[in-house]
C-alpha cells in the first residue's frame, strides 16, 4: 500500500465533508473512569465506580438524562433489551458505557477546536453534577 493510498483511506474514514465543499469537520471521543472515595478509608483513596447497582455507572446515565431533560438538545435514553445502554442528543452526540465501565462521550462533529473544547467543558461540568451524589471525581 502506498502512502497516498493510506492517506486516502484515513481521510475517507476520519474526515467527513461539512456544509460546504472543502470544509472538514471532526469529532471528539473522550473516555473517563468515574472514581469515588473508598468506603471507611481514612487515606482518601479512590476506586472506580461500580458498573451496576444503585451506585453504578448506569445510574450516571440516568442522572445525565435528568439533568438535560429541559435543554434544547436533551440527552435521550437508548435501551437495548430493556437495559439503558447509552444516551444520545438530537444534535448527534452520544454517551455510552464501555466494556470496562468507563463513560465515553462521542461528540457531534464540530467546525473548530474551540467548538470541541467548549462542548467538552460543558460535558465535564454536566458529568460533575451527575456524579455529585457519589462524591465522584
Task: Write out the residue ranges for each language-model feature.
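Terminal catalytic/cofactor-binding subdomain
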Residues: 1-137
Amino acid at each position: 500500500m502506498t502512502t497516498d493510498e493510506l492517506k486516502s483511506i484515513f481521510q475517507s474514514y476520519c474526515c467527513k465533508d461539512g456544509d460546504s465543499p472543502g470544509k472538514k469537520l471532526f469529532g471528539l471521543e473522550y473516555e473517563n473512569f468515574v472514581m469515588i472515595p473508598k468506603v471507611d478509608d481514612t487515606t482518601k483513596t479512590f476506586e472506580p465506580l461500580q458498573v451496576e447497582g444503585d451506585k453504578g455507572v448506569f445510574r450516571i446515565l440516568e442522572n445525565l438524562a435528568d439533568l438535560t431533560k429541559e435543554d434544547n438538545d436533551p440527552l435521550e435514553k437508548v435501551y437495548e433489551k430493556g437495559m439503558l445502554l447509552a444516551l444520545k442528543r438530537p444534535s448527534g452526540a452520544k454517551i455510552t458505557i464501555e466494556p470496562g465501565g468507563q463513560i465515553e462521550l462521542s461528540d457531534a462533529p464540530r467546525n473548530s477546536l474551540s467548538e470541541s473544547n467548549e462542548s467538552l467543558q460543558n460535558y465535564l461540568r454536566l458529568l460533575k453534577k451527575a456524579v455529585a451524589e457519589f462524591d465522584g471525581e
